Amino acid sequence: MLAALFSIAAVFGFHAEDEPYIVTLPWYELFSSAAKAVAGTIHNPFGLFGARVSVFFIRVLLGYPSVMPLFGFLVLGWHLFRAKPLGPGLFFLVYTLLMALDLSAMFGLSMLPLADLMSGATGRMMASFLSTVIGYPGAWALTAIIAAVLTFYMGRDFIVDTIAGVSGFFGKLLATVQAIRAERHRKRREKEEMRVRKKAERMAAVLEKEQRKRDKKAQRARKAGDASKQKAAPFENSPETPAPVMDVEPAPPLLNPAVSEPVVIPAEVEEIRTPEPAPVRPEEGPEMIIKPGVQEAEADLDERALKVRTHDHVKYRFPSIDLLRRPKDEDESYDERHLAETKDRLLEKLRIYKIDVIRIATTVGPRVALFELELAPEVKISRIKSLENDLAMAMASSSGGIRIIAPIPGKNAIGVEIPISKPRPVVMRSVLQVEKFKNNSMALPIVLGKSISNEVIVDDLAAMPHLLIAGATGAGKSVAINVLLTSLLYSKKPDEVKFVLIDPKRVELKPYKLLKDHFLPKIPGMEEQIIVTDPQKAVSALRSVVREMEHRYELLEQCGVRNIGEYNRKMKDEAMFYLVVVVDELADLMITAGREVEEPITRLAQMARAVGIHLIVATQRPSVDIITGIIKANFPSRIAFQVASKVDSRTILDVSGAEQLLGSGDMLFQSAKMSKPQRIQCPYISLSEVDAITEFIGQQPPLRAECMLPEPPSSSGNGSSSGFDQDRGRRDSMFEEAARLVVMHQQASVSLLQRRLRLGFSRAGRVMDQLEQSGIVSAGDGSKPREVLVKNEDSLELLLRNLD
């Protein structure tokens, strides 16, 4: 590395006036007295040795393009120093060397003033040879074609990474500038809030001072009344001494008409009139406590290792978080006045029905606020449930969205969810930029949204293990599917997860066609149709996935493990990928195919979890003829968006409440771990953001191994394992080549077929099964390697002829 750095610096320090001294001074005289005599006249900053090196590279070799292979040696040295794989470094060195030779020849053909410095003796010699053999225009065309081919096939990754690095740098620079501006705006806002707060404190101090004055005045009045009462007491309590009439005020005394003697006005009259009566205040009820929301720890996804390598050593780059739009810098506060008015209306309605509330607490979410009401011990929960419609009508808003939870799970309280006046939007970027998503250890992490307490909900699809989504048109189902797929694209490599996309509506999942070389496996007979749109082909695709499930169970049985996690830990070189099947509209498939669709979906839902196959099924008709009892029983995790009626809500969730949602991403999430559904605001991701992500991934180099699912059975088949075994009798087109490869290396493994023949994992496994059935390799024995039963190629050719 140091030699390469020195040589690069010496070449850039080349000076033409140094050349005469270097020509007359051989290498072996660099330490002689003659060298000392000319050392002071050398212009190269690295002295005589640097001048000698620069003249050698520029005049003798390739000119200034000589820097390119020197830079290649520098990169190779860096790989050695960091103990990285040498393959990429050697590949880059070869590219720089070939590119330097081609550029040197091109400059040797040109007539530019600096052609001598840009070509060197070697470049001019190559240029002379090419122009003599194929002529001047042919030489130019050949060198240009070579440069284009080298750049496209060998230097493309470097150029793409460089452009991505530069764009990422400017993106982070822009983000830094925006962050500085946001910080300044925040400081100005805090300063203004401080000024308003101080002004309010001064006003409060003045009001408090006035209140103290009024209190002192009232206290003096009460003392004066007490003194008058003490003076009047002797005259009232002494029976022997009559009340002295002449000692009272000069005004004539009032006479009681019922008696003949005059009666003095008692002193209590003066006590009643002197102090000011306190105003009567209405009953306000318990004070409302506003609970703070969850503060999620933020994390920059771009700080992780964005550049990774797949199992077949293809470089892959995760999409940058900058492809998603930033959330608007909006005020995170809420309308306390609206909350107070809502609380007063709620308590007023409860008082009408003589329901006492001991404590009330409020949690403000992105779109709704949850009022937790702790009732008096004598109040029964059944009374609240019977008043659900009355309370909802009393608290009704123009947009609806009111839901009553009686009781709240784990608390001695009921909950009332009411829309807030200032909803806060939730965007995709805000839920991905959190610590729990960046550093998760889940197999298939998916982001669902934000809860009422502003907590980002991240769950593992592999643990669900399947997800059923239902809701009316426009409620947010398609956006939710985009959110789930985007979560997986930001967290998993192409060799870790694949998608089978079934879109009867033909337009919802169209942007994901660009992922065909990375995340979308091919299905025999449907190679051109990356996203399945035809209902009959959707049935074939689901049956193909069923066969993949059966094949994986065979591999698990041979390896002696129970699930995909144990298999991947034991067979790291032949690790299985997770397979996520997305059906965007189940209702259309059930109407057109009916029983044919229900059967493979049911089999996958019942059995596919252990082998890493998971379903995401969406429908806008949550009726019992679409979501049948068999399907519903095998989907413990469900999402309900806004639906039309309580019946639809009970069909999808087994409880009502989805009919009260707001729409536009407002949803209820139910899983096997929950006793009651949880209200979540689904994040929003636009189609332009989805297009940017898929385009970024689609432009990257494709995987070397093609991923192919098993061939689906005929329409008369039922997808059983017997049909699978019969269909395997038709050999794969790569069967003979795989047999020759295995016999030649005397080694049989799925990873060998993947690397050498560029086959996907599933197809390579099927070919290995066919080799086993043909007697070429032995049966698998757990983690032990298979034995090659055919020892030479002659015996193999004889066996292949007999098989034909």
UniProtKB/Swiss-Prot annotation:
It is found in: Cell inner membrane. It comes from the Bacteria. The chain crosses the membrane at residues 61-81, 89-109, 133-153, 158-178. Residues 179-804 are cytoplasmic. Residues 453-650 form the FtsK domain. Gene3D superfamilies: 3.30.980.40, P-loop containing nucleotide triphosphate hydrolases, Winged helix-like DNA-binding domain superfamily/Winged helix DNA-binding domain. It is a multi-pass membrane protein. Pfam families: FtsK_4TM, FtsK_alpha, FtsK_gamma, FtsK_SpoIIIE. GO terms for molecular function: ATP binding; ATP hydrolysis activity; DNA binding. One of its GO terms (biological process) is chromosome segregation. Residues 206-254, 707-729 are annotated as: Disordered. Its main location: membrane. Residues 714-723 have a biased composition (Low complexity). Keywords: ATP-binding, Cell cycle, Cell division, Cell inner membrane, Cell membrane, Chromosome partition, DNA-binding, Membrane, Nucleotide-binding, Transmembrane, Transmembrane helix. GO terms for cellular component: plasma membrane. The keyword Membrane applies. ATP binds at residues 474-479. Belongs to the FtsK/SpoIIIE/SftA family. Essential cell division protein that coordinates cell division and chromosome segregation. The N-terminus is involved in assembly of the cell-division machinery. The C-terminus functions as a DNA motor that moves dsDNA in an ATP-dependent manner towards the dif recombination site, which is located within the replication terminus region. Required for activation of the Xer recombinase, allowing activation of chromosome unlinking by recombination. Homohexamer. Forms a ring that surrounds DNA. Consists of an N-terminal domain, which is sufficient for the localization to the septal ring and is required for cell division, followed by a linker domain, and a C-terminal domain, which forms the translocation motor involved in chromosome segregation. The C-terminal domain can be further subdivided into alpha, beta and gamma subdomains. The alpha and beta subdomains form the DNA pump, and the gamma subdomain is a regulatory subdomain. This is DNA translocase FtsK. It comes from Chlorobaculum tepidum (strain ATCC 49652 / DSM 12025 / NBRC 103806 / TLS) (Chlorobium tepidum).
